[in-house]
């Protein structure tokens, strides 16, 4: 029995049922793949269902307001995915008459669609023999074949895609891709893989050389940067406050937030009270500043560790464009701010 036949036999038994697996509609496959990037399936599935309910077609997504898309995406993180999703939906409607490109090469021209996503769509929806390479595929092949190639090296994708392509064949490439990823997600998992009942144990190089814990190999560790955010939550007798949209490139672009003072370290009450930016929003001589959370909230991103402190400023009058507190839930905000808003304004009322 060949390796591929064994894999497909395993998949037939262990294949999980997901809503996007019931369709070969490229819109649904594309949507699921974008949502599930950097996201666990259990977390991503409700978002997929919500997007399909609100935007059942690519035309519906293209016609949506960006704020609607970001609000629906709220909590998934990596918000550039949502912006690219919306941009690409518009491009498919305007440039392709709402019909998805069918080839890997064409799909790669779409914003936010890389090698992996283009391979998934072209193979699952259009039977193009394009091998997908994700973390699961790297892990399964690196262990089975005993590959020491650093998977974060620039040449790793090409090498592992070629290896997967050799195993794939030309029959049902979409099923093969899903089977290989499923095997990595359920059987050949990162820690404590199920080697005892693995159909490939006999020929697995990593198992036979006792190197399961060493493969796949990465040469670089992500450097994590510490950042200190101080959010200013203004409170007035007439229930007004400030929110502004992040426009700069970086984390949370196009999402909304309270006025922010970013510092090099945790700020004391005295240090923040002296910051001239506070006077941009109100007369601080007639305002009362207080710390809401005594200990900073730690919020981990892929390459950044945020330490967030919320400060309340009670004042009679605000300067500039304000919003009503009762409308604050309408704005797309980072999940850490969403949790704060839900707690703070519930307690306040």
Question: Model segments located where?
Answer:
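Intrinsically disordered, low-complexity, charged terminal extensions of DNA damage-control enzymes
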Residues: 1-16, 22, 185-349
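Catalytic cores of DNA base-excision repair glycosylases
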Residues: 3-194, 200-209, 213, 279-282
